[in-house]
Amino acid sequence: MSADNNHREVKHTLCRMCADRCGVNLYLENGRIVDIDGFKDYPVNKGRMCVKGRAAQDLVYHPDRLLKPLKKTDHGWQEIPLEQALDEIAVKIKKVQQQYGERAVSVWKGEAVGFAQQEDIARRFIHAIGSPNYFSNDTACWVGKYIGYCLGYGQWQMGDYPQAKLIMLWGVNPPYSMATMMQDIMKGRENGAKMIVIDPRLSAVARQADIYVQLRPGTDGALALGLANLLISSNRYDRDFISRFTVGFDKFAAYVKKFTPEYVSAETSVPVAVIHEIADIMAAAAPQIAFHCGNGLEHHINGVNNVRAVSMLDALNGCLDTPGGTRLGEGPGLRGLTLYDEIPLRHLEPIGSTKYPVFYDFRQECHTMMSMDTMLTDKPYPLKAMLLTAANPVLSNPNTDKVKKALASLDLLVVRDLFMTETAELADYVLPAASFLEREELHSDSYQQILA
């Protein structure tokens, strides 16, 4: 913290408008934020910022911002003191648990801007009162990709784009979604890297590609396995890496034989000649190939295996943990700083853990889509209270009418958010939340290298 020549107070922090978490300067006058810009000495963004980050102060001072606790009455919303709201909510939680059991209460943590690190507190709370029912948006976003990578090589990491000879972007549009990643991609391009973009949509980054591959939505896995087949059948894969660091190669090689260029072309609509061209470029660039799968690959019924198939190309080309390839390594270990006990809770039958065991085993959390069925049917047991923080399932979940009916069936619905959302309108209590610029938290950057 410092003061500049204009007597402005300057504080350094991380922007949490997205996962990049750029370093920023906050300029304050009389305790009020008057400007935000990039922190030049921060190694991730090096002083650069996108429009979203520059406008983050609008979250704090927006005229529609929730500032006081609200209680729903027969006459509409009533402002009440925070202490009263917390006391009344606590009494109602106890009543629900006494009537229906400890598991009848749940927490749902959303991903509204700047709320990612609220997970640990939410988990700690719900576990402390005896319920395994922690929900988040991970059911629908990102974790499918994470699981796909973990099934391949144990973790998800970013590519070393500045040193890559080939950058392969699969279902991602970093100019709009990951600005710092795009900076590294531009460095790689300046250093001579070719770029292949695979996406059903002609995105901003696709327009900059050397090769743009437009395929049918959801067929990414077939294309990846077809490329794997070409590399293996032509003996253009990293035999040393495969023999030293992998298991199951023979079974994998046998499985991908059916993914001939002709078969893959029929599945994906990608021309046979283009499939061969991509394989040739990959073989020439290996091991300096930096892959990146976006969330687009996981938004299908075969989403996990789409990403899993692409991760196999990392291994075949020997790209893992090599300059210009995919970075591996331990981050600063935020998981070691969690405030909840990460222990198996299967014996408490968390919602969705039986039907979706892989998801539960990876995340130790419940399935949001199934929560609505549980509220409406009381199966496998009653779910009668929910506390949501920065989540808006009425807007973000499928089947809006079903979501509204399910939430209306609860004995207690509490929403904590920055604004009055569609879900908050249905709540019994609405609590104002602090924005990421108004609270202290531990964060790592998107490359898992820096703790701030």
Predicted segments, located by residue:
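P-loop NTPase catalytic nucleotide-binding module
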Residues: G218, A222-Q288
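A glycine-rich phosphate-binding loop feature that marks nucleotide/adenosyl-phosphate handling sites
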Residues: R244-V247, I281, G296, T326-L337
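Short acidic (Asp/Glu) and glycine-rich catalytic loops that position anionic groups and cofactors
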Residues: S203-Q208, A254-T260, A286-C293, E349-I351, ...
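Extended redox/cofactor-interaction regions of prokaryotic respiratory oxidoreductases
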Residues: E119-M186, N191-V197, G221-L225, S311-L426, ...
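Short, amphipathic alpha-helical segments that act as regulatory/interfacial helices
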Residues: A90-I93, A228, A279, V310-G318
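N-terminal export/assembly segments and adjacent metallocofactor-ligating motifs
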Residues: M1-S234, K258, P271, T389, ...
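Conserved short loop/turn motifs at secondary-structure junctions
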Residues: S106-G114, E267-V270, G294-I301, G333-L334, ...
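Flexible, glycine/charged-enriched surface loops at secondary-structure junctions
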Residues: G101-A104, Y237-I242, Q288-A290, D321-L328
